[in-house]
């Protein structure tokens, strides 16, 4: 496999960007080697600058649920661009996308668009604090809610790969208001609320953790968190930046039957362009400026191109589209388990809908501690052999892989064939 041009570009990039990248996980620090520089994407495939062709399971970390350069998405974005990229004023496309979101999730009474998932979660936290007049927030170990200061505490994702449970630059006086507990441990949450429930403004959670690898909520866990929030007057915030419109038409909230006070979105809702959103109960959202005193604003919020891409993408996500995703994702997960067993490599394949992770672990993985027991060395060996076999996986043991509606049976078969040699390589570690 040729990598000469990627290597040259990476050397140049390191003179321009910290670590040579504009987001840490892209640097391949979790697996070693040189990151591939991508020239273009089409459907379920990526093509790097050296001419290598990969079946893509990163999908820009989730947003490309209908694949790369889908003609209908491209057409709607191009139409929007002809009208103007951004106005700094309301536009009809904001209403068009918001109505489609509420059609899929009718319990969202009001929403606000912004420009990233981080912006959405940071704003939701501010709204919860302002609404409740409380300062403390509760999050869970390994759950990543963006790079906002209050949320970079035991945040998983690239922070986990770097071995940094917190980030330098986050003041202790700020971090002290962020309480953390293990994911999937409802009894621990009950004890914390009994001790200091009156100070907790909100509980925020990834309903399906994606940034510690895929972690699946235990039966009744999300419902139990919601009940505790109701009992103690805290708001329940579900971070659907990754799961929203991916694991089902109604997101994880629809899949697991929970109705939070606030929900945050990103990724799929923008169809590959920068976007975020938060919304929920009208009485809470009506406290947001200019309707209320809690300030939130953004120059590019609701920009027409992102609204167009999101609208086109959600429109394409029909019942048949979700059925295809479920069928192919199940085939991939089952096939990976079978091939790992044949190679005598212990793995745990965690999956919810079209997001999954292969953990190189002997025991079930259900929280941050059990995820950390996975072998990153084995994953690294597996990753590089898969890359050579034409499958582009997330370059970290602690990230989710994704499928799109553009993936085919042939893509999955090719990937499973490549995994036979990859598991054999991992078995040597």
UniProtKB/Swiss-Prot annotation:
SUPFAM superfamilies, A to Z: PLP-dependent transferases
GO BP term, pick one: protoporphyrinogen IX biosynthetic process
Catalytic activity: (S)-4-amino-5-oxopentanoate = 5-aminolevulinate
Uppermost EC category: isomerase
Documented EC number(s): 5.4.3.8
Top-rank taxon: Bacteria
Entry keywords, A to Z: Cytoplasm, Isomerase, Porphyrin biosynthesis, Pyridoxal phosphate
GO cellular component: cytoplasm
Keyword Cytoplasm: yes
Cofactor(s) the protein requires to work: pyridoxal 5'-phosphate
Subcellular location: Cytoplasm
Location, primary (coarse class): cytoplasm
Pathway(s): Porphyrin-containing compound metabolism; protoporphyrin-IX biosynthesis; 5-aminolevulinate from L-glutamyl-tRNA(Glu): step 2/2
Cross-referenced Pfam families: Aminotran_3 (PF00202)
Entry annotated with the keyword tRNA processing: no
Entry's Gene Ontology molecular function annotations: glutamate-1-semialdehyde 2,1-aminomutase activity; pyridoxal phosphate binding; transaminase activity
Disulfide bonds: none
Residues forming coiled coils: none
Residues carrying N6-(pyridoxal phosphate)lysine: 267
Subunit record text: Homodimer.
Protein family per UniProt: Belongs to the class-III pyridoxal-phosphate-dependent aminotransferase family. HemL subfamily.
Protein name: Glutamate-1-semialdehyde 2,1-aminomutase
Originating species: Anaeromyxobacter sp. (strain Fw109-5)
């Amino acid at each position: 496999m040729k990598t000469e041009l990627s290597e040259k570009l990476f050397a140049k990039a390191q003179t321009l960007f910290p670590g040579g990248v504009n987001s840490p996980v892209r640097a391949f620090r979790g697996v070693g080697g040189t990151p591939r520089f991508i020239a273009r994407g089409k459907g379920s495939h990526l093509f790097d600058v050296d001419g290598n062709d990969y079946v893509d399971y990163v999908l820009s970390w989730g947003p490309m649920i209908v694949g790369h350069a889908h003609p209908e998405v491209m057409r709607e974005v191009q139409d929007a661009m002809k009208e103007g990229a951004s106005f700094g004023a309301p536009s009809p496309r904001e209403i068009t996308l918001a109505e489609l979101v509420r059609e899929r999730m009718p319990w969202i009474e009001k929403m606000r668009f912004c420009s990233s998932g981080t912006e959405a979660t940071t704003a939701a936290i501010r709204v919860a604090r302002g609404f409740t007049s409380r300062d403390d927030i509760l999050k869970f170990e390994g759950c990543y809610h963006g790079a906002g200061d209050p949320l970079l505490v035991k945040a998983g994702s690239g922070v986990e790969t770097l071995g940094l449970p917190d980030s330098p630059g986050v003041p202790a006086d700020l971090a002290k208001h962020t309480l953390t507990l293990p994911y999937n441990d409802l009894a621990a949450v009950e004890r914390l609320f009994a001790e200091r429930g009156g100070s907790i403004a909100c509980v925020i959670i990834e309903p399906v953790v994606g940034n510690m690898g895929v972690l699946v909520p235990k039966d009744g866990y999300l419902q139990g968190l919601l009940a505790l929030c109701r009992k103690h007057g805290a708001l329940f915030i579900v971070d659907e930046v990754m799961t929203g419109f991916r694991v089902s038409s109604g997101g994880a909230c629809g899949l697991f039957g929970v109705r939070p006070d606030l929900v945050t979105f990103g990724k799929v809702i923008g169809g590959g362009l920068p976007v975020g959103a938060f919304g929920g109960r009208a009485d809470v959202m009506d406290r947001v400026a200019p309707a209320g005193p809690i300030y939130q604003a953004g120059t590019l919020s609701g920009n027409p191109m992102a609204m167009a891409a999101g609208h086109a993408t959600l429109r394409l996500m029909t019942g048949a589209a979700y059925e295809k995703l479920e069928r192919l994702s199940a085939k991939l997960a089952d096939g990976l388990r079978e091939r790992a067993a044949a190679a005598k490599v212990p793995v745990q394949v965690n999956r919810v809908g079209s997001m999954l992770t292969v953990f190189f672990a002997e025991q079930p993985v259900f929280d941050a501690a059990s995820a950390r027991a996975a072998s990153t060395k084995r994953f690294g060996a597996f990753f590089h052999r898969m890359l050579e076999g034409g499958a582009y996986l997330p370059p970290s043991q602690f990230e989710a892989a994704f499928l799109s509606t553009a993936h085919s049976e042939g893509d999955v078969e090719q990937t499973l064939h490549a995994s036979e040699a990859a598991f054999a390589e991992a078995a040597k570690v």
